[in-house]
């Protein structure tokens, strides 16, 4: 965290006049809000959690109470400011003694980082948009080609699909009584 948090001045009013200065209480609340937001988002990084373990913070009851206090960040009016939602997962896990004790193991930290990077590599915000074309049947069969078949042109795809079905039904499965 920064020693002296940088607080932006109030935005100008709609008539382009300068907004009144913040009261000392409002300024203090803003500093506290930014500091707690920055801290809770630091919890999203496993190496930071490892550092907290090394420095002994995770064994102090006052620090554990502070972590419980930070649970208010799950409320809708606060959660919208969180950029790294993984921090809330780790905030929950930090409430358990087993997780706190495992943070001393660098292999465990490496595994947390691997799982996290794997999650972010495959994570999507929403479902992919479905095209109208994907709802229709494809022009070319998606069935695997036999060794002696060549890829067909799209206009001949439906015709070849029928041939494949006939060929498969003729070949059938080789039973115990049939010769190879």
From Swiss-Prot:
Residues 127-138 have a biased composition (Basic and acidic residues). GO terms for biological process: regulation of transcription by RNA polymerase II. GO terms for molecular function: transcription coregulator activity. GO terms for cellular component: core mediator complex; mediator complex. Residues 145-154 have a biased composition (Acidic residues). InterPro entries: Med31_sf, Mediator_Med31. Component of the Mediator complex, a coactivator involved in the regulated transcription of nearly all RNA polymerase II-dependent genes. Mediator functions as a bridge to convey information from gene-specific regulatory proteins to the basal RNA polymerase II transcription machinery. Mediator is recruited to promoters by direct interactions with regulatory proteins and serves as a scaffold for the assembly of a functional preinitiation complex with RNA polymerase II and the general transcription factors. This is Mediator of RNA polymerase II transcription subunit 31. The gene is SOH1.
